[in-house]
Amino acid sequence: MIDVHVKGVLYGIAAALPHMQRRKAGHFINVSSVAGHKVGVNNAVYAATKTAVRVLSEGLRQEVKPWNIRTTVISSGAVATELPNSVSEPDIARGIGQFYETYAVPADSFARAVAFAMSQPEDVDINEILFRPTRQAL
């Protein structure tokens, strides 16, 4: 999880940042999670990686202002993705699968959040969007 959720974000930033700085424009969209705001049982490491994405993004936001680069973190609740299939512990995977079957919203909901952040005027920086399915308590 650390390699994908934390190092992957860092590598993506490192690859794109020089190009955005040259253009004096750009927009990073980093993916966190509701888990980055609230830790639940059996997901401390996942929550830690998603919290790291939020913290890295906030630091990046402050550092890239001279180049007119925007930074948005999308923290979502349950979205219909492959996440439930990536859990290796059978009991936890079963629980997550049932949770997602009950609560997950379509991936299009996530796409609309991204489109909202990107469609703002150049002088507006939507720093964070936190959304959940209406029925999701966590």
Predicted regions span which residues?
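A hydrophobic alpha-helix adjacent to the NAD(P)-binding/active-site core of NAD(P)-dependent oxidoreductases
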Residues: 1
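Active-site helix of classical SDR
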Residues: 13, 49
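A short helix-coil junction within the Rossmann-fold of NAD(P)-dependent oxidoreductases
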Residues: 15-24
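Active-site-adjacent segment of SDR/Rossmann-fold oxidoreductases
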Residues: 38, 59-69
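Active-site loop immediately N-terminal to the catalytic Tyr-X3-Lys motif
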Residues: 38-44
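C-terminal helical subdomain
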Residues: 69, 73-74, 81, 93-137
